[in-house]
């Protein structure tokens, strides 16, 4: 039996030519940084460097920072990406040249109508949407929304108490995920759910499906290797967001608008209602109001952007406090002194608590949930005296910078004092960037901090947290694109007294 297929000469020539063309395609851009004299890890044909993310992008970036210094080049498939770490370079990209060159984030995947969301939209469309949304995230608006949010602090205490009373260590992510989901659904859509105790509520089940995708899945890898597939998928209405979830929220927003028009009531202060209210302003700027599709996209992106970040950060904070009991005790003392007898905080009091702010900031330094900041150049540009063409990606490895000994003594240690009033002045805002920086920073930053601080106050008023045999020490991080622990964080939870306010 012949081991080699019996093809005609023409077939063999065609096969060989196809392989040559495939190899040329798979490597055509991979000499880009070498020509410029910029160091970096060697890319693989088709994949570039993405397979090196299997241990986590954060791990890959730290290795590159140590090996290549302040700047290096990498490849996501055929896409050249320039990594920069110098504060002046970062400021130029995120602030000085934001509107002229680096307006847009990298568009990696098919998202359908979700490209209208503020974090995914581009150029003038992004500027208009951001301008419309920004007034909804001011301190004044958040104070109006605070009465909606504070009830979920009590639900959080009740749910955690129920788990703690079982006498077993508690897996935090499920409890904190429910708190995060409840607040997001309430503030984005004005719907009250207790997601921990009602996991089959359609709002809960459809929202949770938004997060179920793997950045190293065959679908997403196909886009990395063959970027032109994104346009094909868009034409076929294939998106990374589940179709049934998008359909559910589309119907809900449509129904909410109909009810709004019928009742002509505008007193609710959730984001959906505020966006619908803005459509009714009859002024010279009315042509800039958000369309129905844009309102839908913002409502969904609030869930997508807020759920994982809040629940994961809360888990990281409680782990840090449990493994640093002196810090936990000091924070409880500040809370008890500021809010005696488990008094409920006001928005202003909560935001003025100095040690609470220090603990949150230090946790966000150690565990920034989004461990990279990325932009796509829309014009030719210069960095460090070198010229780069339009279409070059630029990446800031924020996790690596947050753990860089050049800027942080003993960078892997949890030390809230780094963010004291005295020390905070010495922190470079282009090194510490848990919410990004510049005009395209996280629009929901104030909202996220409010949710985190409310949860921390209510939890530490009522409980103390301790490591147990199931607690992983030291904590190992996972490989997901959004930073998570490799294994769920499990802690022992002890009531501070018998009477828990709000439970």
Curated annotation (Swiss-Prot):
Reported function: Cytochromes P450 are a group of heme-thiolate monooxygenases. In liver microsomes, this enzyme is involved in an NADPH-dependent electron transport pathway. It oxidizes a variety of structurally unrelated compounds, including steroids, fatty acids, and xenobiotics.
Entry-linked InterPro entries: Cyt_P450 (IPR001128), Cyt_P450_CS (IPR017972), Cyt_P450_E_CYP3A (IPR008072), Cyt_P450_E_grp-II (IPR002402), Cyt_P450_sf (IPR036396), Cytochrome_P450_3A (IPR050705)
Similarity annotation: Belongs to the cytochrome P450 family.
Cofactor (UniProt): heme
Organism: Cavia porcellus
PANTHER family, per database record: CYTOCHROME P450 3A5, CYTOCHROME P450 FAMILY 3
Protein name: Cytochrome P450 3A14
Keyword Transport: no
Catalytic activity, reaction form: an organic molecule + reduced [NADPH--hemoprotein reductase] + O2 = an alcohol + oxidized [NADPH--hemoprotein reductase] + H2O + H(+)
Bilayer topology annotation: Peripheral membrane protein
């Amino acid at each position: 039996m012949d081991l080699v297929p019996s093809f005609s000469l023409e077939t063999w020539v065609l096969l060989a030519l196809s392989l040559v063309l495939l190899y040329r395609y798979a490597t055509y851009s991979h000499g880009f940084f070498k020509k410029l004299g910029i160091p970096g890890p060697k890319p693989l044909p088709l994949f570039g460097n993405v397979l090196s993310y299997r241990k986590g992008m954060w791990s890959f970036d730290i290795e590159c920072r140590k090996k290549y210094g302040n700047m290096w080049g990498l490849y996501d498939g055929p896409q050249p990406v320039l990594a920069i770490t110098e504060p002046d370079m970062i400021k130029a990209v995120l602030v000085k040249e934001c509107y002229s060159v680096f307006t847009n984030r990298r568009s990696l995947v098919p998202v359908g109508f979700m490209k209208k969301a503020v974090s995914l939209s581009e150029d003038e469309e992004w500027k208009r949407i951001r301008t419309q949304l920004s007034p909804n995230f001011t301190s004044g608006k958040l104070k109006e929304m605070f009465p909606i949010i504070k009830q979920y602090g009590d639900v959080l205490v009740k749910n955690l108490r129920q788990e703690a009373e079982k006498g077993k260590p508690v897996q935090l992510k499920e409890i904190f995920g429910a708190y995060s989901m409840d607040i997001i659904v309430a503030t984005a859509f004005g719907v009250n759910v207790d997601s921990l105790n009602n996991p089959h509520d359609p709002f809960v089940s459809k929202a949770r499906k938004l997060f179920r995708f793997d950045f190293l899945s065959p679908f997403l890898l196909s886009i990395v290797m063959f970027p032109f597939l994104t346009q094909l998928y868009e034409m076929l209405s294939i998106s990374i967001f589940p179709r049934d979830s998008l359909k559910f929220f589309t119907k809900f927003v449509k129904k909410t608008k109909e009810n709004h028009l019928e009742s002509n009531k505008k007193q609710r202060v959730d984001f959906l209602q505020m966006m619908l209210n803005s459509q009714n302003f009859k002024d010279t700027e009315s042509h800039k109001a958000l369309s129905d599709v844009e309102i839908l996209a913002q409502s969904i992106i609030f869930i997508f952007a807020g759920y994982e970040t809040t629940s994961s950060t809360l888990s990281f904070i409680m782990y840090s406090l449990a493994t640093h009991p002196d810090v936990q005790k000091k924070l409880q003392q500040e809370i008890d002194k500021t809010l005696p007898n488990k008094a409920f905080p006001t928005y202003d009091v909560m935001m003025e608590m100095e040690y609470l702010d220090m603990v949150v900031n230090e946790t966000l330094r150690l565990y920034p949930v989004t461990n990279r900041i990325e932009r796509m150049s829309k014009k030719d540009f210069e960095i460090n005296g070198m010229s780069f063409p339009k279409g070059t990606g630029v990446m800031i490895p924020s996790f690596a910078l947050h753990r860089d000994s050049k800027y942080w003594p003993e960078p892997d240690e949890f030390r809230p004092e780094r963010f004291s009033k005295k020390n905070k002045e010495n922190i470079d805002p282009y090194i510490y960037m848990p919410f990004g920086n510049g005009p395209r920073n996280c629009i929901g930053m104030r909202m996220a901090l409010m949710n985190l601080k409310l949860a921390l106050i209510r939890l530490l008023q009522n409980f103390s947290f301790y490591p147990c045999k199931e607690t992983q020490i030291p904590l190992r991080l996972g490989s997901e694109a959004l930073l998570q622990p490799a294994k769920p964080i499990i802690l022992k939870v002890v009531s501070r007294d018998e009477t828990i306010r709000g439970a």
